[in-house]
Amino acid sequence: MVSLDSSVALISSSDAPVFPAPVLDRLDRAEIWCREHGQRLTETRRQVLGLILSDVKPSGAYDLLAKLRATHANAAPPTVYRALDFLLETGLIHRIERLSAFVGCTHAIDCGHGCDHAQWGVHRAQFLICRGCGKARELEQDSVAVVLLEAARAVGFQPESATIEIEGLCAVCQRKDKAADSDQA
């Protein structure tokens, strides 16, 4: 068995990645969501989404390409970029601009209250990005986005997307920094 990382394993070089059960569940829900909205989650799109959902950190396009090549030796950058474009357009993933990387959207298929987020009109997200460990966490604070969208509309601006990226240190990295500081004292 060849391992891509601790969360994704390959049975052989010609097989698709085997994802953990929670990722498989999200992939199945994404496939249903796509079908209900007249879209098709192809096998390549599903694999790229699965790789993104399996990673604890935002995934860059070339990192995704390298992982995809483990199962599809002939995968090329356009293959990954087309899949990423589709996943972005459907709102299943977000692009974190400052990292030039991608994360799964926690609202599109996981909000837990049956919302049709395609009806929102403006895809909105807020991210906390840790400069220590590189992890990104999507916030579920619609009130932040609503205030910004209302302010934009008040001046005649029609928003199409709204993403806020806040960089800092997560709780784990803050504890590590404090421990390192106390060791040096």
PLM regions and their residue ranges:
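Short, Lys/Arg-enriched N-terminal segment that forms or immediately precedes the first helix
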Residues: 25-37
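Short helix-coil-helix linker/hinge
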Residues: 41-44
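Pre-recognition alpha-helix immediately N-terminal to the DNA-recognition helix
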Residues: 46-51
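Short capping segments at the starts of secondary-structure elements
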Residues: 55-60
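A short acidic, leucine-rich amphipathic alpha-helix
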Residues: 63-69, 80
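Short coil turns linking two alpha-helices in DNA-binding domains
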Residues: 76-77
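Basic amphipathic alpha-helical segments that dock to polyanions
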Residues: 80-90
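Non-DNA-binding regulatory cores of transcription-related proteins
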Residues: 88-90, 94-185
